[in-house]
């Protein structure tokens, strides 16, 4: 997949400029005690929207226009709601955003499944073979991530560890794990929104310039820094430096693994989309809550995360 400076510029403006331009609004929301979750949801749409807008403006031939326009329209709606949420009463904004995600995801499947196969193949949207390999990769990812969560809780010891084991003896995590399966099909678009930008577009662009390994690492760094507005005003406002460091650790190492998975399965974009979905959504299963805002992160947490993620995922850089 070849690109040029004009397309890269459009991508960068959508993927990076918009999130950073949202920082004053995030600050306003934080100062006024308003929920900033909708900004995080909207930001996931921007990378793919940048790719799609770049391709459409370049008048590339044979683009899947219906799907592209749908995603861009959904992105515009999410962006508009984010802006409005900073100034208008917040009741209902997140519910409306979730409704938009569901409707857009369902329409997305319809447009994709009724699109010509040649268009899907030309623009990296086909579900390729090697499904058994993809399944093995997903199982590995779930197993090691679950083990990492258990290890982190075990290191806390005492009542925290006992309570966590008791949580797994209830039906809650198992029911939530089952619910996540159909939920993927109703909410895939934000995760696709990131992976189509990072893995399908930016990774090969940087690998062509810097080589396969350095290109994958560079995307991981850029992906991590892309989260900076959320690190400052959503994930961990009180320990933002630690949050940024932890984000870089996670994005560089997971970026290596997601790129490995993408290329191992014949550049099948749907595998990193599923992996990204599992990484984000399984938090509900692992912890019993979907709230990832206002975290308190220590430098010890960052160091432990760097060791675990580095040991588990960085070796795939050599694969």
What are these language model-derived features?
Residues 2-4, 57-67, 90-92, 120-128, ...:
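Membrane-interface helix-boundary motifs at transmembrane edges
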């Amino acid at each position: 997949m070849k690109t040029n400076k004009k397309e890269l510029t459009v991508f960068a403006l959508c993927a990076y400029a918009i999130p950073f331009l949202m920082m004053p609004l995030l600050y306003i929301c934080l100062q006024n005690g308003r929920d900033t979750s909708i900004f995080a949801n909207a930001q996931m749409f921007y990378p793919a929207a940048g790719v799609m807008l770049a391709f459409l403006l370049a008048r590339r031939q044979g683009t899947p226009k219906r799907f592209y326009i749908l995603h861009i329209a959904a992105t515009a709606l999410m962006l508009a709601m984010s802006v409005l949420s900073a100034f208008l009463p917040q009741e209902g904004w997140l519910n409306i955003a979730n409704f938009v995600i569901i409707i857009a995801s369902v329409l997305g499947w319809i447009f994709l499944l009724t699109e010509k196969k040649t268009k899907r193949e030309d623009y990296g949207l086909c579900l390729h073979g090697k499904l058994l390999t993809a399944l093995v990769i997903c199982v590995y990812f779930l197993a090691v991530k679950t083990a990492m969560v258990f290890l982190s809780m075990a290191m806390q010891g005492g009542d925290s560890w006992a309570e966590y084991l008791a949580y797994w003896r209830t039906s809650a995590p198992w029911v939530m794990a089952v619910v996540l399966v159909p939920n993927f099909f109703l909410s895939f678009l934000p995760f696709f929104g990131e992976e189509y930008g990072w893995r399908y577009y930016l990774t090969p662009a940087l690998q062509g310039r810097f080589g396969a390994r350095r290109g994958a690492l560079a995307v991981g760094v850029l992906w991590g820094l892309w989260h900076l507005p959320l690190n400052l005003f959503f994930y961990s406002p009180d320990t933002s430096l630690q949050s940024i460091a932890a984000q870089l650790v996670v994005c560089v190492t997971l970026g290596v693994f997601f790129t490995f998975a993408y290329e191992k399965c014949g550049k099948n974009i749907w595998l990193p989309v599923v992996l990204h979905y599992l990484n984000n959504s399984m938090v509900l299963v692992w912890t019993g809550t979907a709230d990832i805002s206002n975290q308190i992160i220590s430098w010890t947490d960052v160091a432990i995360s760097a060791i675990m993620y580095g040991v588990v995922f960085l070796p795939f850089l050599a694969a």
